[in-house]
Structure formats: C-alpha cells, structure tokens
UniProtKB/Swiss-Prot annotation:
The active site is at C456. Its EC number is 2.8.1.4. Keywords: ATP-binding, Cytoplasm, Disulfide bond, Nucleotide-binding, Redox-active center, RNA-binding, Thiamine biosynthesis, Transferase, tRNA-binding. This is tRNA sulfurtransferase. InterPro entries: Rhodanese-like_dom (IPR001763), Rhodanese-like_dom_sf (IPR036873), Rossmann-like_a/b/a_fold (IPR014729), ThiI_AANH (IPR020536), ThiI_fer (IPR054173), ThiI_N (IPR049961), THII_Thiazole_biosynth_dom (IPR026340), THUMP_dom (IPR004114). PROSITE patterns: RHODANESE_3, THUMP. NCBIfam families: ThiI_C_thiazole, tRNA uracil 4-sulfurtransferase ThiI. It comes from Escherichia coli O9:H4 (strain HS). One of its GO terms (cellular component) is cytosol. One of its GO terms (molecular function) is tRNA-uracil-4 sulfurtransferase activity. One of its GO terms (biological process) is tRNA 4-thiouridine biosynthesis.
Length: 482
C-alpha cells in the first residue's frame, strides 16, 4: 500500500532551505509515529510530497488514521501506483478502479501531471472522462459540484489511482518551533490550547498544579497522555506535577479575599517559569480567554504576566467558551474535561476584576515564598511515555455514605469563609471543622479511633481528599453525601 502525504500550504511558501528543513523534520516525525505499526515501512521525502510505503495490509487503517493526526500534513492520498503505456491504458485502469463508485452518480475527472509526455493534463481529463461516461451508462459528467471526483496523478511512466483522500490537521511539524510548557488542568481550555501549540509545531511539555491529591493528578495525566499519544507522539515530552496545596493553604490563610485569584495565578506563573528555565523551555502556554473569569481581564492578565520574564502564550485569548468546547469535542478531550473536578473553596468569593499592583504586592509580602520554592524543588518530573503504565495503578475507592453511625464524625473541609457563611449543623452527629488545605498536616492529630465523614458542598473535594488520606494510610475516612 502507498500513501502520498501533501504538505500544509504554509510550508510550501517558505524559502528553499526552510522548506527542506520542515520536510526533513516531518519525514522523521512520520517515521517515529508509524514505526509502532510497521517497522518495515518506507518513508521517502520529495520536494512537494512525502511517500509512505507499507507492506502490512492489516495495518492500513491504523496507519491512515495516524497520518491524519500528525501536524504538518494537509491531506493524505491513499493510492494505487501502477505503470501505464498511453492514455487509453490510463482510461482502462481508471474504469476498473472507479466503475462501482460512479454508478448512478455525477462525476468529473481531475488530473495532475509531472514529467515529459505527449499529452497534457486536460487531454487526459477529457479522454478518461469521456470513456467513463460511455462505459458507465448510469453515470453523468458534471464539471461543477459533482458527486464524485476522479483524482488521477501521472508522474513519468507511473499512474497514481487515488483510492481516497483524507484531511490532515495541517499546521507545522512538531520540532520546527521551540519547546513550550503548557499549564494543564484537565479542563476544556488547557487541553485545547496545548493542542493548538502542537499543531503550530511546538513540542509541548505539561505542568500540572495539583490541588486535590493523587486522584486528580491521575485524571490530568490521562488528558496529557491522550493529547501526546494522539497528536505529539513523535517526540518525548515531560509531565511535571507540582503539589500546590501548601501554596493554596498559605494564600487562603494570609491573603485578602479579593486578591486571592490573581495572586494564585501569579504564584503558578512563578513556579512554571522556574520549571521552564530548568528545562530550557522558551514559553508558557495557558488556556486563558479574555474576560472568561475574574482573573482574565486585561488588567489582571498584565499583573500576572509581570511576575516573570518568560513569554506567556494564550492561543484562546479571543475565543468564547462554545468555540473552545467545540474544539475540545473535535480533538477528543471533551469527555475528559466534563468529568474533571472543580474545587470548592479554592477561589475567593468576591474576586477583583481590576487588581491594583501596589495592593497585590502588599498582599504578597505576607506570603512565605520559601513554600513556593519548596514545592517547585520537589516537583515530580516523569517521561509522558511512562504515564500509561503509572495510571493503571489501582486507585483506592472510598465509600460514600448518606447516613452515620455512633462512632462517626462529620469533617467539614470547606474553607474558613465558606464555613462561616454557611455553618454545617447535622442533628445527631458531631461536626468538626478542618479546611482541606490543612488535611495533609493536621488530620493525623484527630482521634483515629473515630470514623471521619468528609464533607464539602459539591462532594468533589471531599472525595479526592478522602482518596489522598487513604493513600497516606488512613482507613477511617468516608465521604458524606446526604
């Protein structure tokens, strides 16, 4: 079997040296991806296309599908490559190939020709089109908007009978641009923005700020691995996980409510910039869209950018949520994003939309930056190829209950402000307050002879924190969902 890879048009308008470099990189990327399907296949580059020849017919569909997801490819032609002698021979071969497709349909013939011949492309179109029209009684020629277009390519003494055309994702080959670090949360925005930078030729590494224990990290790892495996597996990339719970705890305890959102983002950018510098990455990528939430106004984005010299790319800055969700659906991350948890109490109740630099800096003076340095130093860096095996590890399930026994205590893990606004009172059982960001250090001080029923309003944080505690060896925890 043979595939002809057509280049993304922006590649073809580059200078000769740049075009050759892009084609060489794309050829290598194709080899890296397809070697998993057929180690004997051949990838041959030409000035205006790349040929892929494979012997294992059983892998035809898998190879074709993989090619449609490699950045830099405009479209793929699945072809049958045969010799020919003259125009009548071309017609006879086209009749055998296309007869069934043309029964009862309107059609036209389009020919591309390279080499020296005693006929032109139009001559072939007329001869083959007329012959097909005569020999297939139910078919009818229609030059504009036909139901079927018969594509033929003539190159020297070879005829390419095009059996199918399949659209690629376009863009530039990965590796033609420099590396970037995507701040990935597993939601709609960060997944789409990561894809857009891969499509533009960047090798995308991932940085995840963990606010909810191992279960949340596993979910985000799965999203990152999916994106890499589907669109970027030609290159090795890093997945860096930073435990940001201590940072969030410090913010919630010391920072004024209205400034929390902007300061949290500034801390994330500081941390990600340190990671980027460590690994020689040139830019950060975020999924922020202008005005989508309070921290994404122009004033706040400028203040967030000011904490680092590292370039921050925001490919979704002018996109609305509906457009982003549609893109997530197209690339296959929608289902991941819909089930990814959102945390209760992490963001302030009345965030500022126009933060003042002096106020932000004054609030940050209360922050212990050694905490930020420590979590960055302890960041977990893994090769994304290892994630598939790691995420198959068993995640201990935590029992969810809607009632309680005599030895049970409800543990309200909401933030202090939420607890003050809506105190939890349940008749017949004790309620103890311990904000989620203190669980990792304070839960061990509680009476371990009691069973603790973790509770928050949405039930997401309570489940993830219960999973985290189970992983730490505490088996006396359940999730309370009345």
């Amino acid at each position: 079997m043979k595939f002809i890879i057509k280049l993304f048009p922006e590649i073809t308008i580059k200078s000769q040296s740049v075009r050759l470099r892009f084609i060489k990189i794309l050829t290598g990327n194709i080899r890296n991806v397809l070697k998993h399907y057929d180690e004997t296949l051949a990838v041959v580059r030409h000035w205006d296309n790349i040929e892929v020849r494979a012997k294992d017919e059983n892998q035809r569909l898998a190879i074709r599908d993989a090619l449609t997801r490699i950045p830099g490819i405009h479209h793929i032609l699945e072809v049958e490559d045969v010799p020919f002698t003259d125009m009548h021979d071309i017609f006879e071969k086209a009749l055998v190939q296309y007869r069934d497709q043309l029964e009862g349909k309107t059609f036209c013939v389009r020919v591309k020709r390279r080499g020296k011949h005693d006929f032109s492309s139009i001559d072939v179109e007329r001869y083959v089109g007329g012959g097909l029209n005569q020999h297939i009684e139910s078919a009818r020629v229609k030059l504009t908007n036909p139901e079927v277009t018969v594509h033929l390519e003539v190159e020297d003494d070879r005829l390419l009978l095009i059996k199918g055309r399949y659209e690629g994702i376009g863009g530039f080959p990965i590796g033609t641009q420099e590396d970037v670090l995507s701040l990935i949360s597993g939601g709609f925005d960060s997944g789409v923005s990561s894809y857009m930078l891969m499509r533009r030729g960047c090798r995308v590494h991932y940085c995840f700020f963990n606010l909810g224990g191992a279960a949340h990290e596993i979910g985000v790892r799965q999203v990152a691995h999916y994106l890499w495996n589907r669109f970027g597996s030609s290159h090795r990339v890093r997945f860096v996980a930073i435990n940001f719970e201590p940072v969030v705890g410090e913010i919630l305890e010391k920072i004024d409510d209205g400034q929390m959102g902007v300061i949290l983002k500034r801390m994330m950018v500081r941390a990600a910039s340190k990671v980027a510098e460590r690994y020689g990455v040139q830019a950060l990528v975020t999924g922020e869209a202008l005005g989508q939430v309070s921290s994404q106004t122009l004033t706040n984005l400028r203040l967030i950018d000011n904490v680092s010299d590292t370039l921050i790319l925001r490919p979704l800055i002018s996109y609305d949520k509906e457009h982003i969700i549609n893109l997530a659906r197209q690339i296959g991350t929608e289902d991941f994003a819909r089930t990814m948890p959102e945390y209760c109490g992490v963001i302030s109740k009345s965030p500022t939309v126009k933060a003042v630099k002096s106020k932000i800096e004054a609030e940050e003076e209360k922050f212990d930056f050694s905490i930020l340095d420590k979590v960055v130093e302890e960041a977990n860096n893994v090769d994304i190829r290892e994630i598939a095996q790691q995420t198959e590890q068993e995640v201990v399930e935590v029992e969810t209950v809607n009632g309680f026994g005599p030895n049970d205590v409800i543990l309200d893990i909401r933030s202090v402000d939420e607890q003050e606004d809506k105190p939890l009172k349940v008749e017949g059982i004790d309620v103890v307050s311990l904000p989620f960001y203190k669980l990792s250090t304070k839960f061990g001080d509680l009476d371990q002879n009691r069973t603790w029923l973790l509770w928050c309003e949405r039930g997401v944080m309570s489940r993830l924190q219960a999973l985290y505690l189970r992983e730490q060896g505490f088996n006396n925890v359940k999730v309370y969902r009345p």
